[in-house]
Amino acid sequence: MHDARIFNSSSNKTMNQNDEAGKSKIKPLRTNQRRVIGASKSSSHMGSHVGTTLIIGKNSHSTSHGVRNNSPENTIVIGRRNFSDGQIEYTKPASHSNKFKKDSILRDPNIDSNVEASKKLSEQIQLTVWFHEPRTSTEDVIIDASVIPGLKEGDICELVPLNTFKPHKKPKRLIFIIKNQSLLSKSSSLHTSNNNNNAGATTSTLSANNNNTTKTKTNFQISLISNPLQNLMDLPPRSLVQLKTILDVESIEADTIEIFIKDINLSRDLMWTFSSSLVGTCVYSEKRLTFLSNRTGVVKKIYKNGNELFSALICEKTKVVFRSKSAKLVFLVQLSREMWHFEETGEIMFHKLVNTLFPKIFKKWRDKNTHHAITIVLFTSVDLTNIPWTSLGQGERPNNRRDYFRVVVDQVSIFHWDRIMANLRLEFANFKRDIMLNCQPENNGKFTMAGQSLPSVKGNVLEAINVGIHLVNDRFKNTDLKHSLNHFILVTPGTGLFDVDYSLMHETSKKMLSIDCALDIVCLSQPPLHIVPLFRYRDPSKDGQISHCVPHWCDISFYKDSTANSTQWIPHCKIYELQMMGVMENEINDVKIERYRVPNEAKSMVEAMDKYDSDVFKPVNKDSDSKVTRELSSSPEQSTINSKTGTPKENSKPLSLIWNNRTSLLPNSSTARIDVSTTNSSVLGTVANSGKDVSALSSLYTLNKTSADKSVVHAPSIRADSRKGVKENVSRDRKEFNEITRTKLRPRLQKTEEFYKSDDSVSNTSKSRDILDSKSRNKQSSTKVEEEFETLTNLLWTEIRNPSKESHSDMLSFLRLSRWNDIFPSNIKRRLVKWRSFESPAALPVTTSIFPSTKQLETDYSFQIYSVFLNSENDLEIESTHDLMREMIQLRLLLGFQICYSDQVKKFESSRKPGGNAESLIKYFPKGSCYGSRIYMSLDDEIHRISCDYNGNLYVQMYRKIEELKHSRLLGSKDYRQQSYVPLIRTRYVDEYAPAKFDFINTKPLKYNWNQFDQLIAGYDDAIPPEKRQFHKMKFVVLPANIPKNAYFISNENLTDEEIRVEGLRKLIGLIERGKFVKSDDKESKRKEEILPEISFYTGNLYEFLSDQAETYDATGNEPSNSLMLGENMRFTKSIKLSQLAQELQSPTGVRLVDRTWHFKRHLHCFLGNELVSWFIECFEDIDNRNDATSYGQSLMDRGMIKHVESRHGFLDGYYFYTFEGEYIDKNYKPERLNSGWFNRKKNSSEKGSAVTSPTYTRNNSDTESAKSPVFPVQDNLDLRKITSNSIGQHMYDSETSSMAGSSTKTKQKKKFILSRSVKFNADPLKKSFRPEIVTVHYDRVHNPEHCYHIRLQWLNTTKKFIDDAILNWSRLCERHGLKLVETPWLELCTIPQVNPFHSFVDLKLVINPWTDPEFSDPNILKDNKFYYHLYLMKKSDFLLDNRSTVFFSKDHIEISYSWGKPIFQYAQYIHKTGAYIVELRDNGDLFLAPNNIHITRLNTSLSSVPEQDYLKSYKMDSQKVMLKFRSACTNEKILRGIFKEAKENWREKCSEVVLPAIN
């Protein structure tokens, strides 16, 4: 290997130009260095001390033309060469290792393996590295096949830089797989070019050039992608690297990789598919990954055997963890009484939260460029009883208590961190006052103090978790396309010990296992000396005995300020007397600490301290052994009494309690018989307690009392242990003591620090525990853990018998039982604070190793089986059983299921008879045939086995756990199932706390009928009724915005703002219609595609428009004789005479001619430009597209046949009014006489309203009926809900009902209209996905430009990334036409508090009531419309109508519905033009406001993705300003009176229709 270690030599040695003729040269990096690579000989001149070079190449075959020769004669030639001598060659015997063959690595079977080359490539070879740009090639590594022969597709190579400049730094290894695209040969000639930057460094890029000469084709050996590998590996251009092939593939396989995603909603089903696509590939840290041709994530961490790697291979066993940098975080901050206490460092707990913890988290978020949306809620529980909480026993909580929740911020972007912190500090300052003061109306409205806040150990932690779970209870409601997951963070000042109710603990645990959200508990106090998190409860199955458990669904962290002195000792236990010593010393409370006297015989202070330590920690003598033996032999009753008192018997010094607590952890001490040594969170902190039932504060009271006083202290009334439990404890401890005495171990010194080591690290166990754990005990314990893991009895939590003395194996058992176990890399030490979980929360893994035993599945589970057959005609366009099985698996993953993949699953599958085959189990979906495959999936207490037999039949076998009988309720405990849990919640802008409108505890997660789901996916639409298909839904409104400078324009035309916006809506609908999903065998002709459905625009009254439409249809909904349907024989050409064409256009089969009203201007005998264009395409043989039709229409205008009604435009394809010139008007046409005045016209029932219809030309397809008119088919019997209350709509729409007054006395048959159209939209037109991505789009067919235009989306399992891309395209089109696409909630505003209790709301009452104010209570105005002033205020404040109330649709002769369902809105709803706020108008005239959080979050997230965030700060959506401005207008009498005066003046000038377009 001496020849392989080549270093740079002097630059004066150059090669002879004549000898190297025809060879290409690499331009030197510096002028004083020169390296020459010969293409013909494939040699590398790297220099040596003796003037030799390393020759890598072929002997007998020239490779100057890049020809790959795989003949056995080809060998790699490595030798020493002097420029004046010939080439020296030598070869080595060939040997090929079969170990390199790996099933997960795909290879081309047509490429023969080069035996000798593989042998030689297993050794390190030095090459010169070049770099290429991503625009040239996306491959990470490109290798010249002629330079390194023998490489073939599928080989795994390792590249290591020769970093001679930084010998102290370990070089990074790059693992990569040889692909067909990464090997360059003659067919893919590349040209190299050098680009010099400012620093003088050379960056080599590759560009394809088929016309280059031979000498420029192979002037490089290996090239890496410049970004990011050049910076990551710290490689300068033209540096040396070592290359070799990897034979032992298992040595480079990663155990766990972490992929970070941002600004994308990657659902769990796509995580599974994404992970499957990564199997068999190599990744490196900071590698950008693409999925479905979209940038999806970045690899951040790679682990193997507890070590972090730079690069590795992903195999099927690799755990792929996804972390989100754009998640929805909910902070639940427990403001228990400890939050106002001082810590040992002198800092108040809450100041520690707001001054150190939150700022540090925000700083990490900003440094990592995360885009989270956070919600912060303060909560606490107030004890309303007069009983001191210290008298409560373990596991007990006061029955009479009241819970408070205060919302600080709700779904706010972390970009506003400064405002968030200001609100947090303000709310903390007022929180205690607000919850303690209660107004007494019967006592003249005076405020009184009621109750006291409970400590964290007795707080409402589980209740707060249930309230948070309600936010994510329904997975179909998560339609945020920018945030991937939800995460809960509970901040508490306690130590991680909580007293809970058993039934509530059980229900909460089941809910947490049924959702895919994680919970992190952050404790602000010091870590205790017991296992955490620890939940303590009274177990009904054990007659109320105290039990401790560690749940499997949460993690815990202990925050410690890094600025504190690391050398400062902080006690883990808080003792009140020591804390207050020197501050409140008096005769009543006196703590005496004797001064330590140095012995006279001591030579030095160090020797004195050593002697003291020796005396304290001296070995246990025989007397103490006998004493323990006598105590263990005592009666059970005496043991129970000792356990309750827990006080020392001999030493009565004030500090004896501290010492006894330290020694109580010794297994052979007198307190070894006590089961639990816990830390209770007291009024002043956490206090150590050696007694099991004595409270912490009660023990503290005994510090300064005499022995006579100690006898007065009583234990709590409820006993924790029964006699049977005490006997078992005594028997077990006696056995442990006998094992210790029989071993006759040498006594050793017990150090204090051993008893205070944290149990958070499973590897650190005390030495005293080693004495207790003998070989037999270890063997039994390990066997017991394995048996417990084999037969899982409780997946919710692990019961802990002694939290302060837990064995290593028991800790491993509950760590293995978590659904989140796969996100933790093996052999990695976990930190005290899980910053990574706060910065980028992890998604629930798609796989789990948890699986019940065969015996449990046979006895504790019910069984059900059904088959699924594919319907060839299905909405999801599934074409094969292979695709159907994949969709069934992905839908389950989307709704929270995990794939069971472990040895236990294989064991169960092997035991199945008949047909059990563990080899057929799959973790990822096979790329080929799925016949014979089977997969197990689990969620909560449900397991599904999906299998496909070799005949192509799909079967689903479901195992459901049989519910056990409920335990009887303990006396004195609270039963949450029999009464609703109604806490008091105060949202962001509300002044007072109000009862919640939902029972958060008794509401369980949704359960789905999977048989119906699978049948629906298979194509059977009747499996689930349409009204029950509550899948993913999104609603968008199109609002008018400012016209941009680059707005849409037409040459030589001056369009108004309204005309530009109307044209934008038409183009938007055209874009949706052209994106319809059409099968390849169902393509329409180009002529038919040019005729698209049009929007029917109108102004004024909607019912006048619909009444006009109803007159053209009979009661059955059929078209009259003068239909627009054209016969097949009606075809014209452009040569038709103008007179004949005018006659045809005005005939019953021509274009629709009506009298139209637009903005109160009457246009007689006119038509629309877009309708005429569609008529031309349908009727003219020589017109096939809309452009030709528009040009022909312009020619008709130029020839004087038609004209614009106002002579402002030429002929345009759009919503423009045109009429005939006088000489071409039909002689039989007689204009109707117009009545003078708006009121008279309105009362004339025979007068047609402002009707504008859509084209009704035949399309010869399935959409014919829906394209004709908005009339709903008669066979669709839709009945609107009846509204019996006298609500707002009855008064608000009097002006509209009056338009029907003239016909109300006549009996008319009800006409049914559908005002929207549904389209199966293809969200993936470029076919990037492996399946059809279909979304159902509903858009309005009638629209008033002064209202909101609606677009609604519905889908089941479509990839959200494609939906987001489609929405972005629509939004860009809207912006160019002065429109804004805004996302709004699907449901109406008044229902949101039931979905999200933390959503901010504002209730407004007008400071002036126009109904009672003498100045505005004009009977003429209020009689016509009671809400006239309210609606004018809305219009004045830039609010547009969104939803009408249901009363508006309850007319006698017209029934209105939509393609997405029935309109059942209770109140009229309006949206601000910015999209930031939504307002509802109530019956009593009050206003109900709420921010449009989904739009605000989406907008701020998009702006945050731009690098220069500070520059864009002014562009951030600030909904609070909109609310404050509107609230000031409603609550300021002067401003509101001025608005109402203006409204009254306008009423006098105009009719009500002029002022009230916003109500139609």
From Swiss-Prot:
Record's subcellular location: Vacuole membrane
Residue numbers spanned by region Disordered: 1-30, 188-212, 617-654, 756-784, 1237-1270
Polar residues bias (residue ranges): 7-19, 631-649, 1247-1264
Skewed-composition ranges (Basic and acidic residues): 617-630, 767-776
GO terms assigned for molecular function: GTPase activator activity
Family matches, as InterPro entries: DEP_dom (IPR000591), IML1 (IPR027244), IML1_N (IPR048255), WH-like_DNA-bd_sf (IPR036388), WH_DNA-bd_sf (IPR036390)
SUPFAM superfamilies: Winged helix' DNA-binding domain
Entry keyword annotation includes Membrane: yes
A GO term from the CC aspect: GATOR1 complex
Record domain DEP: where: 1147-1222
Highest taxon of source: Eukaryota
Protein family: Belongs to the IML1 family.
Protein's UniProt name: Vacuolar membrane-associated protein IML1
Native source species: Debaryomyces hansenii (strain ATCC 36239 / CBS 767 / BCRC 21394 / JCM 1990 / NBRC 0083 / IGC 2968)
